[in-house]
Amino acid sequence: MNLFTSIFSAFGLSASAGLNAYIPLLTVALLARFTDLIELSSPWDTLEDWWVIGTLSVLLLIEFFADKIPAVNHINDIIQTFVRPTAGAIAFAASAGVIADSQPAFSLILGLLVAGGVHAAKSLAIRPAVTATTGGVGNVPISILEDIISTVLSILAIVIPILFAAIAIVITAWFVWWLWRRASRTEARQRM
């Protein structure tokens, strides 16, 4: 990957980690191990080891089911508050190429901030709104949707990073609009 595409890939993978910590890491590990789409430099090439792939697979299964069980999903989100930004930092640094080679701390911080921001939006705005409006019934479908989005974004971030950038801009714009609309409605209700 060249510098431009590796930057988009890094941002895409770290954003994806904000939704599910293990999907982007497992995607990177599997694609690095079995294809030429991504080449990991040391120390990130450890992700290609079988024991790491196996561990990520087990953690993904645990996260998948924990996020679908009421009450357990809240505990999972608390734990993931630390795990997802860390996974985002690793995904960013592993895929950022030149940036990670010259400024590893900078790439780790960027990944941490991107994944942390996505996770914060998910756990502080989206999930509470879904829980409040559906009485918790919508949490499982939203969780499945988050896993699907994380998987698609992880693959797009590596295969077609420019397309990911366009999708990320659209999703970010929609999310800002949604927050603004929600705040406006809340303000209008408070005036009544």
Q: Where on the chain are the PLM-derived regions?
A:
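Hydrophobic, membrane-inserted alpha-helices
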Residues: T5-F11, G88-A91, E146-L156
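Mid-bilayer segments of alpha-helical transmembrane spans in multi-pass integral membrane proteins
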Residues: T86-S95, P104-P128, I148
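The feature identifies polytopic integral membrane transport proteins across all domains of life
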Residues: I109, A129-I142
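Membrane-interface capping segments at transmembrane-helix boundaries
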Residues: W177-Q190
